[in-house]
Design a protein with these regions (language model features):
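Single conserved hydrophobic/aromatic residue that forms the stacking wall/gate
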Residues: 1-5, 9
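Distinct, well-ordered alpha-helical segments
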Residues: 6, 17-32, 47-55
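Glycine-enriched alpha-helix->loop->beta-strand junction motifs that scaffold or abut catalytic
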Residues: 10, 27-36, 53-62, 104
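Catalytic beta/alpha-barrel core
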Residues: 10-19, 35-45
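Conserved, mostly hydrophobic/aromatic
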Residues: 13, 37, 54, 64, ...
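His/Asp/Glu-enriched short active-site or ligand-binding loop at hydrolase and phosphoryl-transfer sites
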Residues: 36-43, 58-72
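Terminal-tail/helix-coil boundary detector
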Residues: 56, 118-164
Length: 164
C-alpha cells in the first residue's frame, strides 16, 4: 500500500474487523492510516477499548451488525424495550441513537422503505446518561455472531464464495 499512497490519485482507505493490535501493525508498516474501521458493534459487543483507540488515532468507528443480527433476543431485551417505550421509539431506533451518541457511524441495512425512514428518525431525541449506562451494562465483551480470532473461522471467511 505504501507505493500506492504516494500516487497523485491517493484516496482514503478503510478497513474492516481490524483489532487494535492489527491496526497498530498496519500503522508501523504503512504511510497512511485508514479513515474508518468497520467492526462488529452493538449493545452485546460494544467494542469500548476499540472505540477509545480509534478516537485517539483519528479513525472513524463504523458499526457492523448494529442489531447483532437479531441474536440474543436483542429486539425483545427488557432494558432496550423499556428505553424504547419511554421515548415512544422502536428498539432499533434506540440502538441507532445509542451508537450515534457514542460517535459510532452506522449504516443499517434495510430493504423496506418504512424501516429506512424509521432508521433515519433518530435525531430528535437523546438518551439520558442513565439510559446509556443501562445499555453499557449489556456488553458481554464477545461476539454472538462469530469469533474473528478463531483460525478456522477466518479461513472459512477467506474462502467463502460470494458470487458465481
Amino acid at each position: 500500500y505504501s507505493s500506492a499512497a504516494s500516487d497523485v490519485y491517493k484516496r482514503q482507505i478503510g478497513v474492516t474487523s481490524f483489532g487494535n493490535e492489527r491496526l497498530q501493525d498496519l500503522f508501523l508498516h504503512n504511510e497512511v492510516k485508514p479513515a474508518v474501521n468497520q467492526i462488529e458493534t452493538h449493545p452485546f459487543f460494544q467494542q469500548k477499548e476499540a472505540n477509545v483507540f480509534l478516537q485517539q488515532e483519528g479513525i472513524q468507528h463504523e458499526a457492523w451488525a448494529p442489531f447483532a443480527e437479531g441474536k440474543n433476543g436483542i429486539f425483545q431485551h427488557p432494558v432496550l424495550k423499556t428505553i424504547a417505550e419511554k421515548h415512544g421509539r422502536t428498539v432499533g431506533q434506540v440502538i441507532l441513537r445509542w451508537l450515534n451518541q457514542r460517535g459510532v457511524v452506522v449504516i443499517p441495512k434495510s430493504v423496506r422503505k418504512e424501516r429506512m425512514m424509521e432508521n433515519l428518525d433518530i435525531f430528535n431525541f437523546t438518551l439520558t446518561d442513565e439510559e446509556m449506562k443501562g445499555i453499557a451494562g449489556l456488553d458481554t465483551g464477545k461476539s454472538p455472531i462469530y469469533d474473528d480470532m478463531d483460525l478456522p473461522t477466518v479461513r472459512g471467511i477467506g474462502t467463502h464464495k460470494i458470487h458465481d
